[in-house]
Structures are given as C-alpha cells and as structure tokens.
Curated annotation (Swiss-Prot):
Binds 2 manganese ions per subunit. Pathway: Amino-acid degradation; L-histidine degradation into L-glutamate; L-glutamate from N-formimidoyl-L-glutamate (hydrolase route): step 1/1. Its cofactor is Mn(2+). This is Formimidoylglutamase. InterPro entries: HutG, Ureohydrolase, Ureohydrolase_dom_sf. It comes from Staphylococcus aureus (strain MRSA252). Belongs to the arginase family. One of its GO terms (biological process) is putrescine biosynthetic process from arginine, via agmatine. The lineage of its organism: Bacteria, Bacillati, Bacillota, Bacilli, Bacillales. The gene is hutG. GO terms for molecular function: agmatinase activity; formimidoylglutamase activity; manganese ion binding. It is an enzyme of class 3 (hydrolase).
C-alpha cells in the first residue's frame, strides 16, 4: 500500500526564511504522488521513498520494528543543513505491507522506485527490512532491462538464505538465482554471522566479499581496487547498506545488533568509493529499527550518511 509523504515529519530549526544558505532540508523538500509521476526528459534532483515494511524481518526471525525506520530517518534528515542546495528534493512517502505475500509488496515498491530512478539523479530508498534489496533490484532491472547489474552491499551478512518465500535474509540469493547478468560484492562480512553453507554458496556463485576484520582500521588499497574493479565490470551499480554492519555502540537501533561491527566512518569511506560513480542507480539503507534506538542515535546516523551521499 502506497501513501504519499507526510509534511509534518519535516520540521527543524528555522534560521532564515529568505537566505538559501541558511536553509535546512525541511525548507526545501517537496511532496508528490509517485504513482502519478510522469517520466521527465532529464533526470534531476533527489527522490526519497520509504519501505515501511518489516514483514521480511519477522519471517527471518528478527526483531521487528524496522517498518518505523523510514519516518524516523526522514525526521532526522529534515533538520540537517541544505549544503548542496539540491535542485529538487522530493519525499514520495512510503510503501506499507498490506498484501498476503511479501513478494507482492516488493513488486509494488519496485514499480514506484523505478519511477524515481528514472526521474532523479539520485534515489534514496529507506527501510525497513533488507528485503528492500530485492525490491530495489526489481526496480533497477525494470529501468535497465539488458544491462549488467553489479550489486554492492555493505553488510555483516550475505543474506543469501535458501527459503521458500522472500524474507530479509534471502534478497541476494533471489537476485543471483533469477538473473545471470548480475554480480555481487559484500563489504563487512561478520565471521560469526554467517553459517558455513553461506560461505559455500558464496564460493559457488563467485561472490566477492571482504570481512569486517579487514576494515577495522582503514580501507586498504587492495579493497579500494576491488571496489573499483567491480564497478568497472558492470554497467549499472545497485548500492545497498544494512545498518547492522555498524557496531551496536554506534547503531543500537537495528534489527540485528552488530558485535565487532564497523565504525561509521569506515562505512562512509567505503560509500565514498561507490557513490561518485555515475553508474549508481539508487541507494538503499535498511534495518534501521527505532524500537531499539537510543536517543535517535541510529536514525541520526542514517540521516547523516544520506546527507554525505548527496551530490
């Protein structure tokens, strides 16, 4: 079920009503009905769409609450300064789960997300469970029907479980099994968060991955080269971040809190190797769970990541 954006989420400190250099995002955001959006001749600005769904998390036996993530992130983002002076910033609202099967919600989200990708230079998709990634893939493939898609996931988990239905832990297996014209790179894998069968599947499918232990102090030249090579090998890049990759000291409000997770600045450094590429079609950020957040710490962290990602 799709609902348009809520203007009352977008509030903040008012420094000026006339000087754009003093504006914050809540002063520049607009709201549109994405279901009625016509294709523009030239992509411009930024589109934001929320995936207010945690059904996939529940099916994956995780902590529910991530369906409240998109609105919490938007509220935190609203008060940040508009340093980039975005040509357009549109909140398209959220998609909610009201179908019998999760896959139907993912398809509904994909149809809408594809419209944002076509119309904007940057599209941010805010979760919600990491089943958002499969919906993001469907949207990407809709926009780019024949191109090779490189999926880059900053995550503690492979999320390549074999299940009978779509969950927050199956997205990337679904992608790889359904589409031979895709590749998968995972940055931040937790050795204690993945079974041997998942490592075996990664070997079988030639999944590139980097352990969290390799990213604790800095991003090495070898890893930078791996990222650049992966981007070069694909026509389109689908970029996604699962917030459970970040140590719970910094990101307590997630579906599965990380032990020995990454530092936020490491995630930011990794993302800055990816975001500048013109091949990036969209960015999703998943598993922000306000139920377990402390002082809005995780919501603010996601908001600031998006703020840094703006071109």
């Amino acid at each position: 079920m799709y609902k348009q954006g809520e203007p009352n989420l977008w509030t903040g400190r008012l420094d000026s009503e006339t000087d754009p250099k003093k504006f914050r995002h809540f002063q520049t955001v607009t709201f549109e009905d994405l279901s009625k959006l016509e294709k523009s001749s030239t992509p411009s600005g930024v589109g934001i769409l929320g995936y207010a769904v945690d059904k996939g998390v529940a099916l994956n036996k995780g902590r529910i609450g991530a369906k409240e993530g998109p609105d919490a992130i938007k509220q935190a983002f609203a008060g940040l300064p508009d340093l980039n002076q975005c040509e357009t910033l549109v909140d398209y609202g959220n998609v909610y789960h009201d179908h019998e099967e999760l896959i139907d919600t993912q398809k509904e989200f994909a149809t809408l997300a594809a419209k944002s990708i076509v119309n904007h230079r940057q599209t941010f998709l805010l979760g919600g469970g990491h089943d958002i990634a499969y919906a993001q893939y469907l949207a990407t493939r809709k926009v780019y029907p024949t191109q090779s898609i490189g999926v880059i996931n900053i995550d503690a988990h492979f999320d390549t479980r074999a299940e009978q239905q779509s969950t927050s832990g199956t997205s990337f297996r679904q992608i790889l099994e359904e589409d031979e014209n895709t590749g998968y790179l995972v940055l931040g894998i937790a050795q204690g968060g993945n079974t041997q069968s998942l490592f075996d599947y990664a070997k079988e499918k030639k999944i590139d991955y980097v352990f969290a232990d390799e990213l604790l102090s800095h991003v090495s030249p070898t890893i930078k080269d791996m990222i650049e090579r992966f981007i070069h090998e694909h026509d389109v890049i689908m970029f996604t971040i699962c917030m459970d990759v970040i140590d719970s000291a910094f990101a307590p409000g997630v579906s599965a809190p990380a032990v020995l997770g990454l530092y936020p600045h490491t995630v930011l450094e990794l993302a800055k190797r990816i975001i500048p590429s013109d091949k990036v079609s969209s960015v999703s950020i998943a598993e922000m769970n306000p139920t377990y957040d402390a002082d809005n710490r995780t919501a603010k962290l996601v908001a600031n990541l998006v703020h840094h990602f703006l071109k």
